[in-house]
């Protein structure tokens, strides 16, 4: 079933005639990372006027919210194509707002399909510095060119003024371009960042089906059936499912209603500032999988796409793993079950293995290895990087 996206209405005028900074972040993870960046930035420079296309966390951090991008999160070639008209309208609204109000600087956060096209059009319209205009363009958390579409780096060098990356190895990926690239630290390993999860051998099983409606609809039934089968073997098991928005909660409730025997064993919780304790996890491959790995929680990664999107992806994606922790360590810290391999019986067995103490020891060692690789540095390193341009 294809979800219906709300038509983008006209964006509000900025608080000031020309804002200092426009931040554009798609998806819940981008909203979270961008919010921390803006929070740190405004602590240094409270006089700055910041507007954003993002989500509730960016708004809470002090940015004027022009449009909630977290409500329109979609992944997959086919899925994006189905909603081309919507994204085209959103793209034009964004361009019109930028052209009318001329923010001094734009910081793109992840979301490359939208953001790089926008940077290209800003250059074409002579609005960005690369096109002879006045608007500076920074990019925080760049596209995963090490995984696919590596040639984008040359296009980026012609569009952007600078790039801040969150993995140390990414700097080398741009060595053959003229783009200034700086490793600004990963937000999950900064000294003042509290991970959303914590390992506890007596905790619940964590089920993380993702933050996109289509992905949750596809993955959550499989996770619930796997949990049900595992619970037959270990009746004491309980599960906790975290959700990022009321929209996703509605999807989860509908699917959970199809498993009446699990009603008393599965709890739905909104994401919060308090860490969720867990003994094991079944999760999608998104940003939260790295947070789980850093918390030392054993488990497995589950990934299912539209069949055509998956078939196309096999020809363009160059990496052997989809979990960032597995990519960083070059080993399967969390076993991956992709597409047809994501069968409930197999996942149930993986979940039961993850509940074993040996799995917890391996997960803890993996967390230490990842933390050492990401080299935390200054907690405000990303904000310092962006502030130098404002």
Language-model segments: which ranges?
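Nucleotide-activated sugar donor-binding and catalytic core shared by glycosyltransferases
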Residues: 1-390
